[in-house]
C-alpha cells in the first residue's frame, strides 16, 4: 500500500478509484514507515459506485471519506485542524483568507498572484490543514484544492488570517478572535464528541492567540491586495 506525506505526516492509504489515486499522487512518498492508516470500511466501500461516488442520496465519495478521516485523525492526535480557506504564500509567509463559499476567496488570492507575480505561490485554494509541528504552527497544502484545483505540496507559517467580506471600499481591521469565533467554527470540522471538541477548542485557542486576525472588506480591484498586505506588514 502506498504512503503519502500530508501535513508532515506519513499516512498509509490504499485508494481504489482512479480519481482518488490521481488526486493523491503528488503527495506519494517512498517511506516504508507511517504515522497512521486511513482505510474505508466494507460498508463505506459497498456504498460507492464503480467511479467511487455514493450510491446513496448523500453526496459522498471515496475522496471525501478519506479527507474526513484525515481531518479527524489530525485533530484528535496530531495538533491540527482543517480550515476552509484560500491560502497564498509570499516571501515564505502564508496569508489565509476565509469566507463562505462564493464570497470571493479564490478571486482575491488570484489578485495576489497577479500583483506579486512569481513571488506569490498558492498553498491551497480551498481545503488546507493548519497544524503545529516541531513547536510552530504551519498551514499545509493538501490534495483537496476545490473546484479550481490550485495549490502545492508546501507549508508556511501563517502571517495573518483574514475573514473576507465583499465591499465597494477596501479596508482591513484587526479584530479579536472572539469577534469572529462563529466564523472560525464554520470554517472547520466541528466534532460531535465532547473530548474531541475540547481538543479542537484548545488547538484553535493556541493557534489564534498567536496569530493576527483581520476583517477584510474588499472589492475585486488590485488595491484590495495592497490593503490586506499593508495591514500586517506596515
What are these model-predicted stretches?
Residues 1-101, 111-121, 129-234:
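A noncatalytic interaction/capping subdomain that flanks phosphate/NTP-handling catalytic cores
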Residues 105:
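Conserved lysine of the Walker
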Residues 108:
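Hydrophobic positions on the alpha1 helix immediately C-terminal to the Walker A/P-loop
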Amino acid at each position: 500500500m502506498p504512503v503519502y506525506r500530508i501535513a508532515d505526516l506519513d499516512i498509509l492509504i490504499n485508494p481504489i478509484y482512479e480519481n482518488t489515486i490521481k488526486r493523491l499522487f503528488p503527495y506519494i512518498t517512498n517511506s516504508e514507515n507511517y504515522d497512521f492508516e486511513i482505510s474505508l470500511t466494507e460498508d463505506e466501500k459497498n456504498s460507492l459506485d464503480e467511479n467511487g461516488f455514493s450510491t446513496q442520496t448523500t453526496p459522498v465519495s471515496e475522496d471525501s471519506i478519506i479527507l474526513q478521516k484525515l481531518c479527524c485523525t489530525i485533530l484528535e492526535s496530531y495538533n491540527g485542524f482543517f480550515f476552509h480557506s484560500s491560502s497564498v504564500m509570499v516571501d515564505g509567509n502564508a496569508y489565509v483568507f476565509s469566507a463562505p463559499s462564493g464570497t470571493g476567496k479564490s478571486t482575491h488570492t488570484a489578485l495576489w498572484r497577479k500583483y506579486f507575480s512569481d513571488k506569490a505561490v498558492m498553498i491551497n485554494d480551498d481545503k488546507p490543514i493548519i497544524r503545529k509541528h516541531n513547536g510552530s504552527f504551519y498551514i499545509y497544502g493538501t490534495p483537496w484544492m476545490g473546484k479550481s484545483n490550485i495549490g502545492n505540496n508546501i507549508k508556511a507559517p501563517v502571517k495573518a488570517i483574514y475573514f473576507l467580506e465583499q465591499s465597494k471600499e477596501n479596508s482591513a481591521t484587526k479584530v479579536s478572535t472572539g469577534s469572529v469565533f462563529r466564523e472560525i467554527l464554520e470554517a472547520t470540522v466541528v466534532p460531535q464528541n465532547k473530548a474531541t471538541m475540547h481538543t479542537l477548542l484548545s488547538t484553535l485557542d493556541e493557534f489564534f492567540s498567536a496569530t493576527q486576525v483581520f476583517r477584510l472588506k474588499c472589492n475585486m480591484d488590485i488595491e484590495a491586495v495592497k490593503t490586506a498586505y499593508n495591514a500586517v506588514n506596515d
